[in-house]
Protein backbone atom coordinates (compact mmCIF):
# COMPACT_ATOMS: atom_id res chain seq x y z
CA UNK A 1 0.00 0.00 0.00
CA UNK A 2 2.81 2.43 0.84
CA UNK A 3 4.27 2.07 -2.63
CA UNK A 4 0.90 2.72 -4.27
CA UNK A 5 0.48 5.90 -2.23
CA UNK A 6 4.00 6.90 -3.17
CA UNK A 7 3.12 6.84 -6.88
CA UNK A 8 -0.27 8.47 -6.28
CA UNK A 9 1.37 11.36 -4.42
CA UNK A 10 2.13 12.93 -7.81
CA UNK A 11 -1.62 12.95 -8.50
CA UNK A 12 -2.94 14.53 -5.30
CA UNK A 13 -5.34 16.81 -7.18
CA UNK A 14 -6.82 13.87 -9.11
CA UNK A 15 -7.06 11.79 -5.93
CA UNK A 16 -9.14 14.57 -4.34
CA UNK A 17 -11.31 15.54 -7.31
CA UNK A 18 -12.21 11.98 -8.40
CA UNK A 19 -13.99 10.98 -5.15
CA UNK A 20 -15.27 14.56 -4.67
CA UNK A 21 -17.15 14.58 -7.98
CA UNK A 22 -18.39 11.04 -7.30
CA UNK A 23 -19.80 12.18 -3.96
CA UNK A 24 -21.45 15.16 -5.67
CA UNK A 25 -23.05 12.69 -8.09
CA UNK A 26 -24.19 10.60 -5.11
CA UNK A 27 -25.61 13.67 -3.37
CA UNK A 28 -27.80 14.52 -6.37
CA UNK A 29 -28.81 10.87 -6.63
CA UNK A 30 -30.07 10.90 -3.03
CA UNK A 31 -32.55 13.66 -3.91
CA UNK A 32 -34.15 11.63 -6.72
CA UNK A 33 -36.44 9.48 -4.49
CA UNK A 34 -37.71 12.64 -2.74
CA UNK A 35 -38.58 14.21 -6.11
CA UNK A 36 -40.36 11.01 -7.22
CA UNK A 37 -42.24 10.97 -3.89
CA UNK A 38 -43.34 14.57 -4.46
CA UNK A 39 -44.54 13.76 -8.00
CA UNK A 40 -46.66 10.86 -6.68
CA UNK A 41 -48.11 12.60 -3.64
CA UNK A 42 -48.56 16.13 -5.01
CA UNK A 43 -48.51 15.92 -8.81
CA UNK A 44 -50.42 12.69 -9.38
CA UNK A 45 -52.43 12.96 -6.15
CA UNK A 46 -53.72 16.41 -7.11
CA UNK A 47 -53.71 15.79 -10.89
CA UNK A 48 -51.39 18.79 -11.24
CA UNK A 49 -49.80 18.36 -14.69
CA UNK A 50 -47.77 21.55 -14.39
CA UNK A 51 -46.22 20.32 -11.15
CA UNK A 52 -45.46 16.94 -12.72
CA UNK A 53 -43.72 18.59 -15.70
CA UNK A 54 -41.76 20.92 -13.42
CA UNK A 55 -40.57 18.09 -11.17
CA UNK A 56 -39.79 15.89 -14.19
CA UNK A 57 -37.54 18.65 -15.53
CA UNK A 58 -35.88 18.74 -12.11
CA UNK A 59 -35.24 14.98 -12.40
CA UNK A 60 -33.66 15.50 -15.83
CA UNK A 61 -31.51 18.31 -14.43
CA UNK A 62 -30.35 16.11 -11.55
CA UNK A 63 -29.53 13.33 -14.03
CA UNK A 64 -27.51 15.67 -16.30
CA UNK A 65 -25.58 17.13 -13.36
CA UNK A 66 -24.95 13.63 -11.98
CA UNK A 67 -23.73 12.40 -15.38
CA UNK A 68 -21.37 15.38 -15.71
CA UNK A 69 -19.97 14.72 -12.24
CA UNK A 70 -19.55 11.00 -13.04
CA UNK A 71 -17.66 11.68 -16.29
CA UNK A 72 -15.43 14.24 -14.57
CA UNK A 73 -14.71 11.81 -11.74
CA UNK A 74 -13.87 9.06 -14.22
CA UNK A 75 -11.41 11.37 -15.99
CA UNK A 76 -9.56 12.22 -12.78
CA UNK A 77 -9.62 8.60 -11.53
CA UNK A 78 -8.31 7.24 -14.84
CA UNK A 79 -5.56 9.86 -14.97
CA UNK A 80 -4.38 8.99 -11.46
CA UNK A 81 -4.67 5.21 -11.95
CA UNK A 82 -2.86 5.19 -15.30
CA UNK A 83 -0.19 7.54 -13.95
CA UNK A 84 0.31 5.35 -10.88
CA UNK A 85 0.64 2.20 -13.03
CA UNK A 86 3.00 3.93 -15.47
CA UNK A 87 5.28 5.11 -12.67
CA UNK A 88 5.24 1.73 -10.98
CA UNK A 89 5.95 -0.09 -14.26
CA UNK A 90 8.85 2.27 -15.05
CA UNK A 91 10.47 1.90 -11.64
CA UNK A 92 9.92 -1.87 -11.60
CA UNK A 93 11.61 -2.18 -14.99
CA UNK A 94 14.46 0.05 -13.77
CA UNK A 95 14.77 -2.06 -10.60
CA UNK A 96 14.90 -5.28 -12.64
CA UNK A 97 17.73 -3.81 -14.70
CA UNK A 98 19.69 -3.24 -11.48
CA UNK A 99 19.43 -6.88 -10.38
CA UNK A 100 22.34 -9.21 -10.94
CA UNK A 101 22.05 -12.42 -12.94
CA UNK A 102 21.80 -14.29 -9.63
CA UNK A 103 18.56 -12.56 -8.66
CA UNK A 104 17.21 -12.78 -12.23
CA UNK A 105 17.82 -16.53 -12.23
CA UNK A 106 16.14 -16.90 -8.83
CA UNK A 107 12.99 -14.93 -9.67
CA UNK A 108 12.53 -16.27 -13.21
CA UNK A 109 11.72 -14.48 -16.45
CA UNK A 110 8.05 -15.48 -16.64
CA UNK A 111 7.45 -14.24 -13.08
CA UNK A 112 8.95 -10.85 -13.90
CA UNK A 113 6.84 -10.56 -17.06
CA UNK A 114 3.70 -11.28 -15.01
CA UNK A 115 4.65 -8.62 -12.46
CA UNK A 116 5.28 -6.07 -15.23
CA UNK A 117 2.02 -6.75 -17.06
CA UNK A 118 -1.00 -8.42 -15.47
CA UNK A 119 -0.12 -7.60 -11.84
CA UNK A 120 0.39 -3.89 -12.51
CA UNK A 121 -2.77 -3.81 -14.68
CA UNK A 122 -4.69 -5.31 -11.76
CA UNK A 123 -3.32 -2.62 -9.43
CA UNK A 124 -4.33 0.05 -11.98
CA UNK A 125 -7.91 -1.27 -12.10
CA UNK A 126 -8.03 -1.41 -8.32
CA UNK A 127 -6.85 2.20 -7.94
CA UNK A 128 -9.39 3.39 -10.51
CA UNK A 129 -12.27 1.66 -8.73
CA UNK A 130 -11.17 2.84 -5.28
CA UNK A 131 -11.03 6.48 -6.34
CA UNK A 132 -14.49 6.28 -7.87
CA UNK A 133 -16.39 4.01 -5.50
CA UNK A 134 -14.61 3.68 -2.17
CA UNK A 135 -16.23 6.84 -0.76
CA UNK A 136 -19.25 7.05 -3.07
CA UNK A 137 -20.77 3.68 -2.18
CA UNK A 138 -20.60 4.08 1.63
CA UNK A 139 -21.84 7.67 1.20
CA UNK A 140 -24.91 6.43 -0.71
CA UNK A 141 -25.53 3.62 1.81
CA UNK A 142 -25.44 5.82 4.89
CA UNK A 143 -26.99 8.78 3.06
CA UNK A 144 -29.95 6.65 1.96
CA UNK A 145 -30.37 5.39 5.52
CA UNK A 146 -30.36 8.96 6.89
CA UNK A 147 -32.86 10.07 4.24
CA UNK A 148 -35.05 7.12 5.20
CA UNK A 149 -35.00 8.27 8.84
CA UNK A 150 -36.15 11.73 7.75
CA UNK A 151 -39.17 10.10 6.11
CA UNK A 152 -40.16 7.62 8.85
CA UNK A 153 -38.15 6.37 11.81
CA UNK A 154 -39.98 3.05 12.34
CA UNK A 155 -39.77 2.04 8.68
CA UNK A 156 -36.11 3.09 8.58
CA UNK A 157 -35.27 0.60 11.36
CA UNK A 158 -35.30 -2.04 8.60
CA UNK A 159 -32.18 -0.33 7.22
CA UNK A 160 -30.49 -0.47 10.65
CA UNK A 161 -30.91 -4.26 10.75
CA UNK A 162 -30.06 -4.95 7.08
CA UNK A 163 -26.84 -2.95 6.70
CA UNK A 164 -24.79 -4.69 9.49
CA UNK A 165 -25.84 -8.11 8.15
CA UNK A 166 -24.74 -7.09 4.67
CA UNK A 167 -21.43 -5.75 6.03
CA UNK A 168 -20.69 -9.10 7.73
CA UNK A 169 -21.34 -10.94 4.45
CA UNK A 170 -19.19 -8.61 2.36
CA UNK A 171 -16.19 -8.41 4.68
CA UNK A 172 -16.35 -12.10 5.61
CA UNK A 173 -16.09 -13.13 1.96
CA UNK A 174 -13.34 -10.56 1.35
CA UNK A 175 -11.17 -11.91 4.18
CA UNK A 176 -11.64 -15.52 3.07
CA UNK A 177 -10.78 -14.89 -0.59
CA UNK A 178 -7.71 -12.67 -0.23
CA UNK A 179 -5.16 -15.49 0.38
CA UNK A 180 -6.79 -17.56 -2.36
CA UNK A 181 -6.23 -14.83 -4.95
CA UNK A 182 -2.51 -15.01 -4.19
CA UNK A 183 -2.59 -18.72 -5.03
CA UNK A 184 -4.49 -17.97 -8.25
CA UNK A 185 -1.80 -15.49 -9.32
CA UNK A 186 0.89 -18.08 -8.52
CA UNK A 187 -0.98 -20.54 -10.74
CA UNK A 188 -1.05 -17.98 -13.54
CA UNK A 189 2.72 -17.58 -13.14
CA UNK A 190 3.15 -21.32 -13.61
CA UNK A 191 0.97 -21.32 -16.74
CA UNK A 192 2.96 -18.41 -18.18
CA UNK A 193 6.24 -20.17 -17.42
CA UNK A 194 5.17 -23.37 -19.19
CA UNK A 195 3.85 -21.40 -22.18
CA UNK A 196 7.01 -19.32 -22.49
CA UNK A 197 9.27 -22.38 -22.26
CA UNK A 198 7.21 -24.20 -24.90
CA UNK A 199 7.15 -21.29 -27.35
CA UNK A 200 10.85 -20.57 -26.87
CA UNK A 201 11.79 -24.19 -27.52
CA UNK A 202 9.03 -25.03 -29.99
CA UNK A 203 11.49 -26.38 -32.60
CA UNK A 204 13.07 -28.75 -30.08
CA UNK A 205 9.64 -29.86 -28.84
CA UNK A 206 8.55 -30.79 -32.36
CA UNK A 207 11.91 -32.28 -33.32
CA UNK A 208 11.54 -34.82 -30.49
CA UNK A 209 7.77 -35.28 -30.92
CA UNK A 210 7.13 -34.04 -27.39
CA UNK A 211 3.96 -32.12 -28.23
CA UNK A 212 1.78 -34.57 -26.29
CA UNK A 213 4.04 -34.35 -23.23
CA UNK A 214 3.88 -30.55 -23.35
CA UNK A 215 0.10 -30.62 -23.80
CA UNK A 216 -0.22 -33.00 -20.85
CA UNK A 217 1.95 -30.81 -18.60
CA UNK A 218 0.06 -27.69 -19.62
CA UNK A 219 -3.30 -29.41 -19.11
CA UNK A 220 -2.30 -30.50 -15.60
CA UNK A 221 -1.25 -26.98 -14.60
CA UNK A 222 -4.29 -25.48 -16.31
CA UNK A 223 -6.68 -27.85 -14.52
CA UNK A 224 -5.08 -27.07 -11.16
CA UNK A 225 -5.60 -23.38 -11.85
CA UNK A 226 -9.14 -24.09 -13.05
CA UNK A 227 -10.07 -25.93 -9.84
CA UNK A 228 -8.58 -23.16 -7.72
CA UNK A 229 -10.38 -20.43 -9.68
CA UNK A 230 -13.65 -22.37 -9.41
CA UNK A 231 -13.21 -22.64 -5.65
CA UNK A 232 -12.47 -18.92 -5.33
CA UNK A 233 -15.33 -18.17 -7.73
CA UNK A 234 -17.77 -20.18 -5.60
CA UNK A 235 -16.85 -18.19 -2.49
CA UNK A 236 -16.91 -14.85 -4.31
CA UNK A 237 -20.10 -15.88 -6.09
CA UNK A 238 -21.89 -16.15 -2.75
CA UNK A 239 -21.65 -12.41 -2.29
CA UNK A 240 -24.24 -11.24 -4.79
CA UNK A 241 -26.97 -13.84 -4.01
CA UNK A 242 -26.54 -13.43 -0.25
CA UNK A 243 -26.74 -9.65 -0.49
CA UNK A 244 -29.78 -9.94 -2.78
CA UNK A 245 -31.53 -12.25 -0.31
CA UNK A 246 -30.91 -9.89 2.61
CA UNK A 247 -31.96 -6.81 0.63
CA UNK A 248 -35.06 -8.46 -0.84
CA UNK A 249 -36.17 -9.62 2.60
CA UNK A 250 -35.59 -6.06 3.79
CA UNK A 251 -37.67 -4.69 0.89
CA UNK A 252 -40.52 -7.09 1.72
CA UNK A 253 -40.37 -5.99 5.36
CA UNK A 254 -40.22 -2.35 4.28
CA UNK A 255 -43.25 -2.63 1.98
CA UNK A 256 -45.23 -4.50 4.65
CA UNK A 257 -44.43 -1.89 7.30
CA UNK A 258 -45.09 0.87 4.78
CA UNK A 259 -48.47 -0.58 3.84
CA UNK A 260 -49.51 -0.78 7.49
CA UNK A 261 -48.45 2.82 8.11
CA UNK A 262 -50.15 4.07 4.92
CA UNK A 263 -53.40 2.50 6.14
CA UNK A 264 -52.83 4.20 9.46
CA UNK A 265 -52.33 7.52 7.68
CA UNK A 266 -48.78 7.93 8.99
CA UNK A 267 -47.09 7.55 5.60
CA UNK A 268 -48.06 8.52 2.07
CA UNK A 269 -47.75 6.29 -0.99
CA UNK A 270 -45.00 8.50 -2.37
CA UNK A 271 -43.00 8.15 0.84
CA UNK A 272 -43.24 4.33 0.65
CA UNK A 273 -41.96 4.50 -2.94
CA UNK A 274 -39.13 6.77 -1.74
CA UNK A 275 -38.20 4.26 1.00
CA UNK A 276 -38.25 1.46 -1.59
CA UNK A 277 -35.99 3.51 -3.89
CA UNK A 278 -33.56 4.18 -1.06
CA UNK A 279 -33.42 0.46 -0.30
CA UNK A 280 -32.77 -0.23 -4.00
CA UNK A 281 -29.98 2.35 -3.99
CA UNK A 282 -28.43 0.61 -0.99
CA UNK A 283 -28.68 -2.75 -2.77
CA UNK A 284 -26.97 -1.43 -5.92
CA UNK A 285 -24.21 0.30 -3.97
CA UNK A 286 -23.56 -2.71 -1.75
CA UNK A 287 -23.19 -4.91 -4.83
CA UNK A 288 -20.78 -2.33 -6.25
CA UNK A 289 -18.98 -2.24 -2.91
CA UNK A 290 -18.79 -6.03 -2.83
CA UNK A 291 -17.27 -6.16 -6.32
CA UNK A 292 -14.99 -3.28 -5.36
CA UNK A 293 -13.74 -5.22 -2.36
CA UNK A 294 -13.08 -8.28 -4.54
CA UNK A 295 -11.08 -6.10 -6.94
CA UNK A 296 -9.26 -4.43 -4.04
CA UNK A 297 -8.39 -7.89 -2.71
CA UNK A 298 -6.96 -8.87 -6.10
CA UNK A 299 -5.12 -5.56 -6.44
CA UNK A 300 -3.59 -5.84 -2.96
CA UNK A 301 -2.47 -9.40 -3.66
CA UNK A 302 -0.82 -8.24 -6.89
CA UNK A 303 0.68 -5.19 -5.17
CA UNK A 304 2.20 -7.51 -2.56
CA UNK A 305 3.77 -9.64 -5.29
CA UNK A 306 5.17 -6.52 -6.98
CA UNK A 307 6.53 -5.32 -3.64
CA UNK A 308 8.29 -8.67 -3.23
CA UNK A 309 10.28 -7.94 -6.40
CA UNK A 310 11.07 -4.40 -5.22
CA UNK A 311 12.26 -5.81 -1.89
CA UNK A 312 14.88 -7.96 -3.63
CA UNK A 313 18.12 -6.02 -3.66
CA UNK A 314 21.02 -6.79 -5.94
CA UNK A 315 23.69 -8.87 -4.23
CA UNK A 316 26.21 -7.07 -6.45
CA UNK A 317 27.52 -3.85 -4.94
CA UNK A 318 28.82 -1.20 -7.32
CA UNK A 319 32.42 -0.05 -6.95
CA UNK A 320 33.86 3.41 -7.59
CA UNK A 321 36.92 2.77 -9.78
CA UNK A 322 36.56 3.70 -13.43
CA UNK A 323 40.10 3.12 -14.71
CA UNK A 324 43.26 1.33 -13.58
CA UNK A 325 46.46 3.34 -13.12
CA UNK A 326 48.73 0.28 -13.03
CA UNK A 327 49.98 -0.06 -16.61
CA UNK A 328 52.20 -3.05 -15.74
CA UNK A 329 49.44 -5.19 -14.24
CA UNK A 330 48.17 -8.35 -15.92
CA UNK A 331 45.09 -7.95 -18.08
CA UNK A 332 43.17 -10.63 -16.19
CA UNK A 333 44.09 -12.54 -13.05
CA UNK A 334 42.07 -15.22 -11.25
CA UNK A 335 43.12 -16.00 -7.67
CA UNK A 336 41.65 -19.17 -6.13
CA UNK A 337 38.24 -18.44 -7.66
CA UNK A 338 35.23 -20.62 -6.84
CA UNK A 339 31.63 -20.15 -7.95
CA UNK A 340 28.41 -21.69 -6.70
CA UNK A 341 25.15 -20.57 -8.29
CA UNK A 342 22.27 -19.63 -6.00
CA UNK A 343 20.25 -22.72 -5.16
CA UNK A 344 22.85 -25.10 -6.64
CA UNK A 345 24.38 -27.80 -4.49
CA UNK A 346 27.83 -28.21 -6.01
CA UNK A 347 30.31 -25.57 -7.07
CA UNK A 348 30.39 -24.80 -10.79
CA UNK A 349 34.02 -23.65 -10.53
CA UNK A 350 36.52 -24.69 -7.87
CA UNK A 351 39.81 -22.98 -6.95
CA UNK A 352 40.63 -21.52 -10.38
CA UNK A 353 43.88 -19.55 -10.67
CA UNK A 354 45.64 -18.17 -13.76
CA UNK A 355 47.15 -14.95 -15.11
CA UNK A 356 46.69 -13.48 -18.58
CA UNK A 357 48.97 -10.80 -20.03
CA UNK A 358 47.65 -7.97 -22.15
CA UNK A 359 47.12 -8.89 -25.78
CA UNK A 360 47.29 -12.64 -25.20
CA UNK A 361 44.81 -15.06 -26.74
CA UNK A 362 43.42 -17.56 -24.26
CA UNK A 363 41.45 -20.63 -25.28
CA UNK A 364 38.94 -22.22 -22.90
CA UNK A 365 37.90 -25.79 -23.63
CA UNK A 366 36.23 -28.62 -21.77
CA UNK A 367 33.35 -31.03 -21.86
CA UNK A 368 29.69 -30.08 -21.57
CA UNK A 369 28.96 -28.59 -18.15
CA UNK A 370 32.64 -28.19 -17.29
CA UNK A 371 32.19 -24.48 -16.41
CA UNK A 372 33.55 -22.74 -19.52
CA UNK A 373 30.79 -20.11 -19.77
CA UNK A 374 30.72 -19.73 -15.99
CA UNK A 375 34.41 -18.82 -16.05
CA UNK A 376 34.19 -16.09 -18.72
CA UNK A 377 30.94 -14.72 -17.25
CA UNK A 378 32.89 -13.76 -14.13
CA UNK A 379 35.15 -11.37 -16.08
CA UNK A 380 32.42 -8.76 -16.88
CA UNK A 381 30.97 -9.58 -13.45
CA UNK A 382 27.70 -11.11 -14.54
CA UNK A 383 28.04 -13.13 -11.33
CA UNK A 384 30.13 -12.56 -8.21
CA UNK A 385 32.61 -15.20 -7.13
CA UNK A 386 31.80 -17.31 -4.09
CA UNK A 387 35.46 -17.42 -3.08
CA UNK A 388 38.65 -15.86 -4.36
CA UNK A 389 39.31 -12.70 -6.36
CA UNK A 390 39.42 -11.56 -9.97
CA UNK A 391 41.61 -8.67 -11.09
CA UNK A 392 41.47 -6.72 -14.34
CA UNK A 393 44.43 -4.41 -14.95
CA UNK A 394 45.40 -4.91 -11.32
CA UNK A 395 42.01 -3.81 -9.91
CA UNK A 396 39.54 -6.17 -8.25
CA UNK A 397 36.44 -6.38 -10.44
CA UNK A 398 34.32 -5.61 -7.36
CA UNK A 399 36.05 -2.24 -7.05
CA UNK A 400 35.14 -1.15 -10.58
CA UNK A 401 31.98 0.72 -11.38
CA UNK A 402 29.99 -1.97 -13.19
CA UNK A 403 29.39 0.32 -16.20
CA UNK A 404 33.12 1.11 -16.47
CA UNK A 405 34.06 -2.56 -16.17
CA UNK A 406 31.70 -3.63 -18.93
CA UNK A 407 32.95 -0.82 -21.16
CA UNK A 408 36.36 -2.52 -21.01
CA UNK A 409 34.94 -5.92 -21.91
CA UNK A 410 33.29 -6.96 -25.16
CA UNK A 411 31.44 -10.27 -24.90
CA UNK A 412 29.70 -12.38 -27.51
CA UNK A 413 27.40 -14.87 -25.80
CA UNK A 414 26.54 -18.39 -26.94
CA UNK A 415 23.08 -17.36 -28.08
CA UNK A 416 23.29 -14.72 -30.80
CA UNK A 417 20.71 -12.21 -29.57
CA UNK A 418 19.73 -9.36 -31.90
CA UNK A 419 17.04 -6.73 -31.46
CA UNK A 420 14.35 -5.31 -33.67
CA UNK A 421 15.75 -2.49 -35.79
CA UNK A 422 18.35 -1.99 -38.51
CA UNK A 423 21.76 -3.65 -38.75
CA UNK A 424 23.28 -0.25 -37.91
CA UNK A 425 21.10 0.05 -34.78
CA UNK A 426 22.13 -3.39 -33.57
CA UNK A 427 25.86 -2.82 -34.01
CA UNK A 428 25.60 0.56 -32.28
CA UNK A 429 24.64 -1.28 -29.12
CA UNK A 430 28.40 -1.76 -28.82
CA UNK A 431 29.18 1.92 -29.38
CA UNK A 432 26.25 4.31 -29.58
CA UNK A 433 28.10 6.97 -31.60
CA UNK A 434 29.86 4.56 -33.98
CA UNK A 435 30.24 5.96 -37.49
CA UNK A 436 29.40 3.92 -40.58
CA UNK A 437 33.14 3.59 -41.23
CA UNK A 438 33.68 2.09 -37.76
CA UNK A 439 30.72 -0.21 -38.24
CA UNK A 440 32.05 -1.48 -41.58
CA UNK A 441 35.49 -2.03 -40.00
CA UNK A 442 33.82 -4.10 -37.27
CA UNK A 443 31.93 -6.07 -39.91
CA UNK A 444 35.23 -6.69 -41.74
CA UNK A 445 36.73 -8.15 -38.57
CA UNK A 446 33.59 -10.23 -37.93
CA UNK A 447 33.59 -11.50 -41.55
CA UNK A 448 30.13 -9.99 -42.03
CA UNK A 449 30.73 -7.21 -44.52
CA UNK A 450 30.04 -9.34 -47.58
CA UNK A 451 26.54 -10.48 -46.64
CA UNK A 452 25.58 -7.01 -45.35
CA UNK A 453 26.59 -5.32 -48.61
CA UNK A 454 24.56 -7.85 -50.59
CA UNK A 455 21.38 -6.72 -48.83
CA UNK A 456 19.31 -4.02 -50.53
CA UNK A 457 19.35 -1.73 -47.52
CA UNK A 458 22.92 -2.58 -46.46
CA UNK A 459 23.32 -1.11 -42.93
CA UNK A 460 19.70 0.06 -43.04
CA UNK A 461 18.43 -3.48 -43.65
CA UNK A 462 15.77 -4.37 -41.10
CA UNK A 463 16.39 -7.06 -38.49
CA UNK A 464 13.38 -8.85 -37.00
CA UNK A 465 13.17 -9.34 -33.25
CA UNK A 466 15.74 -11.98 -32.31
CA UNK A 467 17.19 -11.82 -35.83
CA UNK A 468 14.67 -14.35 -37.12
CA UNK A 469 15.14 -13.16 -40.71
CA UNK A 470 18.88 -13.95 -40.62
CA UNK A 471 20.76 -17.24 -40.67
CA UNK A 472 22.58 -18.49 -37.58
CA UNK A 473 25.97 -17.58 -39.02
CA UNK A 474 24.81 -14.09 -40.00
CA UNK A 475 23.45 -13.48 -36.50
CA UNK A 476 26.72 -14.60 -34.93
CA UNK A 477 28.80 -12.35 -37.17
CA UNK A 478 26.63 -9.32 -36.33
CA UNK A 479 26.94 -10.00 -32.59
CA UNK A 480 30.72 -10.27 -32.98
CA UNK A 481 30.77 -6.96 -34.89
CA UNK A 482 28.69 -5.42 -32.09
CA UNK A 483 31.32 -6.47 -29.55
CA UNK A 484 34.43 -5.39 -31.51
CA UNK A 485 33.09 -2.00 -32.69
CA UNK A 486 33.86 -0.50 -29.28
CA UNK A 487 37.47 -1.79 -29.48
CA UNK A 488 37.38 -3.36 -26.00
CA UNK A 489 40.45 -4.11 -23.90
CA UNK A 490 39.15 -7.65 -23.38
CA UNK A 491 37.11 -9.59 -25.94
CA UNK A 492 35.27 -12.78 -25.00
CA UNK A 493 33.91 -15.13 -27.66
CA UNK A 494 31.77 -17.62 -25.75
CA UNK A 495 31.35 -20.41 -28.30
CA UNK A 496 30.08 -17.66 -30.58
CA UNK A 497 31.46 -19.03 -33.86
CA UNK A 498 29.72 -22.40 -33.70
CA UNK A 499 27.61 -21.59 -36.78
CA UNK A 500 30.66 -20.52 -38.82
CA UNK A 501 32.64 -22.84 -41.07
CA UNK A 502 36.31 -23.49 -40.28
CA UNK A 503 37.59 -21.08 -42.94
CA UNK A 504 35.41 -18.20 -41.68
CA UNK A 505 36.30 -19.03 -38.08
CA UNK A 506 40.01 -18.94 -38.89
CA UNK A 507 39.65 -15.66 -40.81
CA UNK A 508 37.77 -14.17 -37.84
CA UNK A 509 40.52 -15.09 -35.38
CA UNK A 510 43.19 -13.77 -37.75
CA UNK A 511 41.34 -10.44 -38.14
CA UNK A 512 41.04 -10.03 -34.37
CA UNK A 513 44.77 -10.68 -33.86
CA UNK A 514 45.58 -8.08 -36.54
CA UNK A 515 43.43 -5.38 -34.92
CA UNK A 516 45.25 -2.23 -33.91
CA UNK A 517 45.70 -2.45 -30.13
CA UNK A 518 44.48 -6.04 -30.32
CA UNK A 519 42.38 -6.96 -27.27
CA UNK A 520 43.12 -9.64 -24.75
CA UNK A 521 41.08 -12.44 -26.27
CA UNK A 522 39.22 -15.30 -24.58
CA UNK A 523 37.85 -17.92 -26.97
CA UNK A 524 35.48 -20.52 -25.56
CA UNK A 525 35.00 -23.33 -28.03
CA UNK A 526 34.34 -27.04 -28.40
CA UNK A 527 36.60 -27.05 -31.45
CA UNK A 528 40.22 -27.82 -30.65
CA UNK A 529 41.16 -26.43 -34.07
CA UNK A 530 39.83 -22.99 -33.04
CA UNK A 531 42.16 -22.89 -30.04
CA UNK A 532 45.33 -24.57 -31.30
CA UNK A 533 47.09 -21.27 -32.02
CA UNK A 534 46.13 -19.60 -28.73
CA UNK A 535 48.94 -18.40 -26.48
CA UNK A 536 47.54 -20.61 -23.75
CA UNK A 537 44.60 -22.96 -23.39
CA UNK A 538 42.69 -23.51 -20.15
CA UNK A 539 41.21 -27.01 -19.95
CA UNK A 540 38.27 -27.41 -17.58
CA UNK A 541 36.83 -30.64 -16.25
CA UNK A 542 33.79 -30.56 -13.97
CA UNK A 543 34.62 -27.06 -12.72
CA UNK A 544 38.29 -27.78 -12.06
CA UNK A 545 41.37 -26.83 -14.07
CA UNK A 546 42.63 -30.00 -15.74
CA UNK A 547 45.49 -28.21 -17.45
CA UNK A 548 46.86 -24.86 -18.65
CA UNK A 549 49.38 -24.51 -21.44
CA UNK A 550 49.96 -24.36 -25.16
CA UNK A 551 48.41 -26.83 -27.56
CA UNK A 552 51.64 -28.83 -27.76
CA UNK A 553 52.14 -28.89 -23.98
CA UNK A 554 48.59 -30.03 -23.30
CA UNK A 555 48.76 -32.67 -25.99
CA UNK A 556 51.69 -34.18 -24.11
CA UNK A 557 50.54 -34.00 -20.50
CA UNK A 558 46.76 -33.34 -20.22
CA UNK A 559 44.54 -36.40 -20.60
CA UNK A 560 41.31 -34.37 -20.81
CA UNK A 561 42.70 -32.25 -23.66
CA UNK A 562 44.04 -35.35 -25.42
CA UNK A 563 40.62 -36.96 -25.25
CA UNK A 564 38.92 -33.86 -26.71
CA UNK A 565 41.56 -33.33 -29.41
CA UNK A 566 41.79 -36.92 -30.62
CA UNK A 567 38.00 -37.28 -30.68
CA UNK A 568 38.09 -34.59 -33.37
CA UNK A 569 41.31 -35.66 -35.14
CA UNK A 570 41.18 -39.46 -35.13
CA UNK A 571 43.42 -39.91 -38.16
CA UNK A 572 46.27 -38.05 -36.47
CA UNK A 573 45.91 -40.31 -33.44
CA UNK A 574 45.99 -43.45 -35.56
CA UNK A 575 49.06 -42.18 -37.41
Task: Kindly give the residue locations of the regions a language model identified.
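ABC-type nucleotide-binding domain
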Residues: 325-575
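Pre-NBD coupling/linker segments of ABC/ABC-like ATPases
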Residues: 314-327
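Transmembrane helices of ABC transporter permease
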Residues: 10, 14-27, 62, 129-184, ...
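Membrane-integrated ABC transporters
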Residues: 1-32, 36, 44-58, 73-77, ...
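Helix-loop-helix
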Residues: 48-54, 147-161, 231-305, 309-310
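Helix-loop junctions and hydrophobic alpha-helical segments within the transmembrane domains
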Residues: 8, 92, 96, 205, ...
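An intracellular "coupling" helix at the cytosolic face of ABC transporter transmembrane type-1 domains
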Residues: 9-13, 98-102, 118-131, 135, ...
Amino acid sequence: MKRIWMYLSAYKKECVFAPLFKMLEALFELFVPLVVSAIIDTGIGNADKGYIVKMSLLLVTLAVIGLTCAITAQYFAAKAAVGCATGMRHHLFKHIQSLSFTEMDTIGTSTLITRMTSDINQVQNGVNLVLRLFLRSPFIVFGAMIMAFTIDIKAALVFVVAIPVLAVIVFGIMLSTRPLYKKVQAGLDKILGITRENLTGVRVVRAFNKQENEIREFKQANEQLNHLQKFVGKISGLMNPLTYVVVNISIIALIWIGAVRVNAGTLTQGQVVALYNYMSQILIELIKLANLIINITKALACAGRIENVFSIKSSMQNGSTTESTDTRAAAVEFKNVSLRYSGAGDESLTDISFTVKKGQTIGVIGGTGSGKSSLVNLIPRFYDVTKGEIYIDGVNVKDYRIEALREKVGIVLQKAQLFKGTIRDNIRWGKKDATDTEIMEALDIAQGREFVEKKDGKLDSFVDQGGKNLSGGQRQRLTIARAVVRKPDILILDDSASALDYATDAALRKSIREMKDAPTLFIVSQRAASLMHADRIIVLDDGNVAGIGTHEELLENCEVYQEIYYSQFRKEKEA
